[in-house]
């Protein structure tokens, strides 16, 4: 009974649980303190339990003549671990200490607040050579610094008789480029330049933050530079919530070649009266058998116009093509295809009837090729 009371007191001292709750776990474990503690922390879901290995008899501390105690106290075990980093390993508890064995319970690591994490990042960067820069002075200095011209040109002759000579410009390897990145440290995460917020707690960002803390350039930034120099600025926004910056339009500054249009613009030279006359002729050219089923087909033209024509169900898709050419004679020399809208599909077999192609009362779009 005395052993059970001792186990109950140690359980309460280690876990801080109420006596009734402690008794429940001990009774469930058959009054085995180690099993009860393990069950308690598994129920909590956070704590890890580590059992210290049994030392050999030669490593056991022997008492002096002045003291006949052969049991290591909690105070001795705690003092032996004072040099450990409690912030990294979590709070330690000891239970069941004896001459030859002991149980050490290590709580979960204390998570750092975002403010502490940002402070550590700046501290680590400064320890590895980073310097604080005045943002206003930096921006004004960068804008006023002239950039030398690195292109080619012609050196003019000093006299009329002296010929001009072409001078080649500086060659730069396209594969090597300098990269300037701004790392913004916010209240709940960080962002790169105008990118999305990345959480401090996301495991996929742990390596990136560790590299910054060690004063190293993260691998993802080195890949951007392709062997060039990476200039990294860190901005402290730890007291601010992340605000997504407004997207800024950036004009294309690269090089390219102007290609010919694959879809030449169709210019209609017909007057409105002439166009109406052409549409009337095209409509009359479609022979409609009133004794057979009829359907209306709406045609959206590539020039923005719209035609609506009545067809029999046994008319074919090629009849629609001929109708378009008759209504818009300028398209006779233009290559185009006919497509459905929903689903968007090209009508490749123009020998199909409208009924076979499921085009009854459909909308057809003309697309230039």
Curated annotation (Swiss-Prot):
GO CC, any one term: nucleus
Biased composition (Basic and acidic residues): 67-81
Role of this protein: Reduces the ATPase activity of VCP. Necessary for the fragmentation of Golgi stacks during mitosis and for VCP-mediated reassembly of Golgi stacks after mitosis. May play a role in VCP-mediated formation of transitional endoplasmic reticulum (tER). Inhibits the activity of CTSL (in vitro). Together with UBXN2B/p37, regulates the centrosomal levels of kinase AURKA/Aurora A levels during mitotic progression by promoting AURKA removal from centrosomes in prophase. Also, regulates spindle orientation during mitosis.
Subcellular location: Nucleus; Golgi apparatus, Golgi stack; Cytoplasm, Cytoskeleton, Microtubule organizing center, Centrosome
Domain spans labelled SEP: 178-243
Domain UBX stretches: 291-367
Region (Disordered): 46-115, 133-156, 260-280
Protein's GO biological process: autophagosome assembly; establishment of mitotic spindle orientation; Golgi organization; membrane fusion; negative regulation of protein localization to centrosome; nuclear membrane reassembly; positive regulation of mitotic centrosome separation; proteasome-mediated ubiquitin-dependent protein catabolic process
Motif Nuclear localization signal per UniProt: ranges: 109-115, 172-175
Protein name: NSFL1 cofactor p47
Predominant location category: nucleus
Keyword Cytoplasm: yes
InterPro entries in UniProt: NSFL1C_SEP_dom_sf, SEP_domain, UBA-like_sf, Ubiquitin-like_domsf, UBX_dom
Sequence similarity: Belongs to the NSFL1C family.
Upper classification of the organism: Eukaryota, Metazoa, Chordata, Craniata, Vertebrata
Record's compositionally biased regions (Polar residues): 260-277
GO molecular function, one term: ubiquitin binding
Keywords (A to Z) from UniProt: Cytoplasm, Cytoskeleton, Golgi apparatus, Lipid-binding, Nucleus
